[in-house]
């Protein structure tokens, strides 16, 4: 958290910097629609109390609906009054088009607060304070766990992560390795540094030379992550002969069929 976006499009899901909660992926659903002429309609799905969307700055274009994001510019979010937020959409949007996307439009704490308030209100609960009262803090050492939610099995998580090339999920998986390794980590080591050390330990245990290996955040969105082709080939070979090979193979996108390879290599022997 606090890291700069990878590029000039911070609103798209691949730019999400994960946190331990990751409520709804830190994303908001945005639905857009337009007729041949007239205003462009925009709404949040689901709606959030105190958050509005202004599409008046969006211009109608003749771009194909399938390429609706070509004329898109990064939205602006501003707190217009205490507890009231407005998301201003910018750029262009095609005529006679409907589109929906999950985007990173507001600070994660605002999103979390609004979702918690909505769920609490639906259960008949009430808050005594106005929106905007969320406070960041460090978990006290003596905190008591009141609920626990177990994630889906590792194989299911991996399948979505690899087929969709989910960078945020990949980063979370690396951090989870670090969290599991923290007990054996040196004092003062961060979760990320413990995860990086755990990856290096695996390469050493498999007797794979890791000269030139640089583990940054575990995803494809890194300016510094490095691995030599020979090292990668050897790691894949070891994985294919390991007990988790079926899960790994099922997670890979099929060329021309699904995932990030759905529209690639069609009509080829691949």
Where are these regions (language model features)?
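Polar, glycine-rich mid-to-C-terminal structural blocks
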Residues: 1-64
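Secretory-pathway/luminal and periplasmic proteins that interact with or process carbohydrate-rich
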Residues: 30, 144, 170, 260-261
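Generic structural motif
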Residues: 42, 53, 70-79, 270
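A small/polar active-site loop signature that marks catalytic segments
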Residues: 62-246
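Active-site Gly/Thr loop motif
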Residues: 205-212, 254-270
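C-terminal structured domain segments across diverse proteins
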Residues: 225, 249-250, 258
């Amino acid at each position: 958290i606090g890291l700069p976006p990878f590029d000039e499009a911070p609103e798209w899901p691949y730019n999400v910097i994960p946190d331990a909660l990751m409520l709804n992926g830190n994303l908001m659903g945005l639905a857009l629609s337009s007729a041949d002429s007239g205003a462009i309609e925009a709404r949040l799905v689901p709606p959030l109390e105190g958050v509005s969307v202004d599409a008046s700055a969006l211009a109608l274009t003749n771009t194909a609906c399938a390429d609706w994001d070509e004329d898109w510019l990064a939205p602006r979010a501003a707190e217009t009054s205490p507890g009231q937020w407005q998301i201003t959409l910018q750029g262009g949007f095609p005529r006679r088009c409907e589109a929906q996307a999950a985007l990173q439009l507001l600070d994660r704490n605002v999103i979390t607060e609004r979702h918690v308030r909505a769920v609490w209100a639906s259960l008949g609960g009430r808050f005594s304070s106005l929106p905007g009262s969320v406070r960041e803090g460090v978990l006290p050492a003596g905190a008591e766990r009141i609920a626990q939610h177990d994630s889906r099995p590792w194989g299911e998580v991996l399948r979505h992560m690899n087929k969709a090339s989910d960078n945020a999920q990949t980063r979370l998986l690396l951090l989870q390795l670090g969290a599991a390794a923290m007990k054996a980590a040196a004092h003062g080591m961060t979760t990320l540094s413990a995860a990086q050390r755990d990856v290096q330990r695996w390469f050493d245990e498999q007797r794979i030379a890791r000269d030139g290996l640089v583990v940054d955040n575990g995803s494809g969105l890194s300016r510094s992550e490095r691995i030599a082709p020979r090292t990668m080939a050897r790691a894949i070979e070891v994985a294919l002969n390991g007990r988790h090979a079926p899960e790994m193979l099922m997670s890979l996108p099929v060329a021309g069929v699904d995932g990030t390879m759905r529209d690639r290599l069609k009509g080829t022997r691949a």
